[in-house]
């Protein structure tokens, strides 16, 4: 699966879980778990509960995702 095949969503961080994993509440009302992308980890971008984030998910598993951007 190439990078272009990912689906992007926006949501709000509702809970912080261990190992830099977060529970995200999407705008549609669904809740998914997501981890931080490597580029965000490398640049020490902190994510807190209540932050608006953009996540990408594959079509194969719509319960897990990767946080790719933190909104200002």
Swiss-Prot record:
PROSITE patterns the record matches: S1_IF1_TYPE
Keyword Cytoplasm: yes
Gene3D superfamilies tied to this protein: Nucleic acid-binding proteins
Cellular component annotations (GO), alphabetically ordered: cytosol
Keywords of this entry: Cytoplasm, Initiation factor, Protein biosynthesis, RNA-binding, rRNA-binding
Family stated for the protein in its record: Belongs to the IF-1 family.
Protein name, UniProt field: Translation initiation factor IF-1
Originating species: Xylella fastidiosa (strain Temecula1 / ATCC 700964)
